[in-house]
């Protein structure tokens, strides 16, 4: 298939683009220029790879989940272990790349948004490493849900700003972070945490996260002598999924499955299934599928997992849905919790609640596949951060 996105204006079909105020246009153009140069600079690539290897701990293993495979009785199940990265999730693949870019551009300060706190921790971590000042915006509700991550960020030297506006979640944190960037743009780089925002952010994040899919491809071929038949990843904004899917987009024999949060059910108001239930609109500088009402007001997204309750989804996912290259599904809070417990009991691996959505969908998919077929799950993060809230949730139930 002929797939080459984004185009030079930063569009993925009708999606993406740069819907930003004049005050930011210069900065996003400057960022695009700096990014292009860095990508062609061997020294930059060498430095990035050095940190990915010695600091992040790449490459991460592709693990054959024998017990899960036996339990499902279908396809061989493999886990791409992004939970084993330094800081416990895929987020650092992107933050290390963007922080090196910030240093290259002569910026002294970094601003970022965070939902579950994973991107905030990964950003604060690389800022500590590279001596950058760090400000993190986090919704008030998420601050409550993720107290430990807030403390971690502060330990790492970051200033955490709690955002009470709106629903006090990720969307509101992004609003405030963008506002902050507008007024500090001369010395500050904004590290977007997902494949969202105005061009070139969705491309930058996708490219830095593509290390996931590139490694998976190589590792799976070494183990099985072919490509996997199916690849599954969870989707909030969509960066772990985009990093996993992008290297496989041209391999049409590989089925790609994105898994959103159905929350209390897609028939209710309490979900974050943007690609299942959303419509096209503009948010945070980019055109994409959104959860919005008939007046175009953004609706609140809900998920048991703080990292999936974003009311939009990356522009590239929006395109991949429309052209049918990726098949998007949703998993409820209860299904994700069940998968969380199952993987923990069967493999001794505690997945993040976000990743548990991908595991839950894989549990439905694997039994429908043949025994000589392979299914890879992107295990995007570890579940230590969620154990406390899961304990609470299970006690209430």
Swiss-Prot record:
The keyword Nucleotide-binding does not apply. Its EC number is 4.2.1.20. It is an enzyme of class 4 (lyase). Keywords: Amino-acid biosynthesis, Aromatic amino acid biosynthesis, Lyase, Pyridoxal phosphate, Tryptophan biosynthesis. Pathway: Amino-acid biosynthesis; L-tryptophan biosynthesis; L-tryptophan from chorismate: step 5/5. Tetramer of two alpha and two beta chains. This is Tryptophan synthase beta chain. It comes from Bacillus cereus (strain AH187).
């Amino acid at each position: 298939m002929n797939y080459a996105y984004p185009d030079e204006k930063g569009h993925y079909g009708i999606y993406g683009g740069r819907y930003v105020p004049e005050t930011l246009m210069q900065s996003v153009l400057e960022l695009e220029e700096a990014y292009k140069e860095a990508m062609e600079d061997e020294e930059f690539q060498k430095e990035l790879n050095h940190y990915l290897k010695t600091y992040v701990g790449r490459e991460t293993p592709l693990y054959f989940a024998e017990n899960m495979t036996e339990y499902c009785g279908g396809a061989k199940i493999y886990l791409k272990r992004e939970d084993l990265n330094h800081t416990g999730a895929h987020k650092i693949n992107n933050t290390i790349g963007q922080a090196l870019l910030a240093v290259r551009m002569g910026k002294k300060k970094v601003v970022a948004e965070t939902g579950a706190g994973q991107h905030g921790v990964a950003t604060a971590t690389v800022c500590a490493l590279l001596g950058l000042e760090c400000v993190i915006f986090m919704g008030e509700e998420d601050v409550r849900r993720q107290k430990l991550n807030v403390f971690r960020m502060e330990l790492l030297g970051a200033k955490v700003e709690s955002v009470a506006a709106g629903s006090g979640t990720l969307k509101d944190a992004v609003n405030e972070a963008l506002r902050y960037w507008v007024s500090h743009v001369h010395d500050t780089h904004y590290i977007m945490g997902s494949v969202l925002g105005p061009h070139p952010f969705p491309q930058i994040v996708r490219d830095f996260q593509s290390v996931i899919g590139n490694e998976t491809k190589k590792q799976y071929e070494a183990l099985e002598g072919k490509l996997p038949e199916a690849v599954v990843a969870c989707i909030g904004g969509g960066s772990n999924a985009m990093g996993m899917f992008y290297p496989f987009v041209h391999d049409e024999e590989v089925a790609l499955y994105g898994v959103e949060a159905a929350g209390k059910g897609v028939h209710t108001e309490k979900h974050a299934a943007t690609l299942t239930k959303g419509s096209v609109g503009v948010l945070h500088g980019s055109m994409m599928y959104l959860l919005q009402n008939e007046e175009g007001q953004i609706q609140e997204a809900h998920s048991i997992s703080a990292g999936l309750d974003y009311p939009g989804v990356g522009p590239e996912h929006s395109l991949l849905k429309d052209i049918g290259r990726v098949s998007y599904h949703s998993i409820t809070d209860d299904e994700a919790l069940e998968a969380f417990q199952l993987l923990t009991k069967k493999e001794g691996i505690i997945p993040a609640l976000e990743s548990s959505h991908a595991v839950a969908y894989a549990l439905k998919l694997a039994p429908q596949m043949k025994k000589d077929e392979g299914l890879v799950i992107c295990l995007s993060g570890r579940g230590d951060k969620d154990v406390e809230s899961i304990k609470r949730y299970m006690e209430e139930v």
